[in-house]
Amino acid sequence: MVLILGRRLNHENSGGVPESPAIKRKVFEMETKTLSDVFNFSSGSSHSESVLQVFNEFRDSRLFTDVIISVQGREFPCHRAVLSACSSYFRAMFCNDHRESREMVVEINGIQADAMDTFLQYVYTGRACITTLNVQFLFETSSLFQITTLRDACAKFLEEQLDPCNCLGIQRFADAHSLKQLASRCRTFALLNFPEVAQHEEFQDLRKDELEEYLASDELSICREEVVFEAVMRWVYHGVEYRRPMLKDLLQHVRLPLLHPNYFVQTVEGDKLIQNAPECYQLLHEARRYHVLGNEMMSPRTRPRRSTGFSEVIVVVGGCERMGGFNLPYTECYDPVTGEWTSLAKHPEYTKSEYAVCALRNDIILSGGRINSSYVWMYNSQLNVWIRVASLNKGRWRHKMTVLLGKVYAVGGYDGQCYLNNVEVYDSFSNRWTEVAPLKEAVCSPAVTSCAGKLFVIGGEPDENSCSNKVQCYDPESDSWQLKACLPFTKPNISAVSLNHLIYVCGGLTKSIYCYDPSQDHWMHVGHTFSRQESCGVSVCNGKIYILGGRGENGEASNNVVCYDPSSGIITSTAAMPRPVSYHGCVTVHRFSEKQHKP
């Protein structure tokens, strides 16, 4: 039993004898076992709010205030304790032996009086009125006084105010104050609304490096590349006297090859500033070549921005299934950015195998096939159909094709009786195949690619018992072949692609990737893949090299996709193919997608 002590209000007992002011008086009984039960009472936030409210009333009436903050000549009576409790800036000022800790009036420079007024309102009430007129000054004030909650509220308010007319200015403000999230949101907003943003005054005030960052982005949201060119020219003409020398650097980020040919001739080549800028002529020449050669000529400027609806995709044509012996009819495209595979029209020659495939402009050419086929088909990427075109003069399989200067070359192969040194060239305008100078050495299953205006035939099998390490180079101007530096290894069923004036070779049941520089006639080892493969598909897409499928040491086909980035040397695995495949065609084209297109 517990006795509760209390105080009797009437100091006279019933007998008239006064008692002690504090007496023992049993009010009620409770078991001791309940003493561990505790009631933790809390009034919630209402208590702290009411205390702050009283302190704010004290501030308004200058009651108990012990410091005056002076800003731009305007005085704000405050309580040191309240300021110190809210701000580490003031806590350091008042709690250490600084001069301000002893002074009645403390002057603060570098901020606005109105911003200080709003700041103090927040300190004493937890509320602040943020507007478009005061947000910048209030942000700077809260940053100075290290009030992160108010600072973050200002940043959030700025994010909600983003508009094509102010997003660039807000991004510059965010960068200046290390607001990474806000800066990122501003940049994303500007990329998504670039055509509108480019019409406003802030765009004309961009620094060259800031403008280049936007122009270089694949995520720039436009319906056509002409919008980018026009934005650049407006920026240059806005301060033409001192911006003229920057024109070439800016145009390097404009994808001139993707402009409509009529627009390019009339508007770009017709511009007086460009006509008087010889340093830009190489960029114009690149665009003209692309208009003629299509995807044969690849550079960062030939890669479509995704918002146009077009993207570079890898198309895999046919091939053999896991254990061989069954030819696949599928034509499928792979988008490395999204990781998606999409089925296209099945190719008509799927009953054959070991045919050759290459990309011509934005279409796909398929020729030959086992046994001794001379048929040639063209896949029209716009119509998604296969069309018969002129047949080869000589049927073959285990040959290779590539495109050089707008024409298709079918090289070497096997006709069922002998290995071929025969080379044919196809002109799509006349729909005709003609023979050119034969190879120095007949080979089948070589690696073939074009680079620096010449055709390279690398390795291959000169007979059924050996492999060649020779590199045969064809010059279309002289219609002649020369031998170049030999391949560092001798393996069958290798593959080659060219990128940035260099040739890359892989496959042949080796993990190695080799690079050949035609200008130096020199080979170098540049990397390793994850597994040994032969008869794999190789294609350049978005500035990287993709190795797809192939046959391993156990003879089984693979569905692996490996990406090699020559700029960094990094090799990664990406989305697997729909099925294992080898001896397949593999090319890169531009493909339109409604999901990506911005109307």
UniProtKB/Swiss-Prot annotation:
One of its GO terms (cellular component) is axon. SUPFAM superfamilies: Kelch motif, POZ domain. It is found in: Perikaryon; Cell projection, Axon; Cytoplasm; Cell junction, Desmosome. Residues 167-269 form the BACK domain. Keywords: Cell junction, Cell projection, Cytoplasm, Kelch repeat, Repeat, Ubl conjugation pathway. Disruption phenotype: Morpholino-injected embryos show heart function anomalies detectable after 48 hpf. Heart defects initially manifest as pericardial edema, changed heart rate and reduced blood circulation, and later result in ventricular failure and blood circulation block. Kelch repeats lie at residues 313-362, 364-406, 407-453, 455-501, 503-543, 545-591. InterPro entries: BACK (IPR011705), BTB-kelch_protein (IPR017096), BTB/POZ_dom (IPR000210), BTB_POZ_KLHL24 (IPR030596), Kelch-typ_b-propeller (IPR015915), Kelch_1 (IPR006652), KLHL24_BACK (IPR047071), SKP1/BTB/POZ_sf (IPR011333). GO terms for biological process: heart development; proteasome-mediated ubiquitin-dependent protein catabolic process. Its main location: other. GO terms for molecular function: ubiquitin-like ligase-substrate adaptor activity. Pfam families: BACK, BTB, Kelch_3, Kelch_KLHDC2_KLHL20_DRC7. Residues 65-132 form the BTB domain. Forms homodimers. Component of the BCR(KLHL24) E3 ubiquitin ligase complex. Necessary to maintain the balance between intermediate filament stability and degradation, a process that is essential for skin integrity. Reduces kainate receptor-mediated currents in brain neurons, most probably by modulating channel properties. It is required for proper heart development. This is Kelch-like protein 24a. It comes from Danio rerio (Zebrafish).
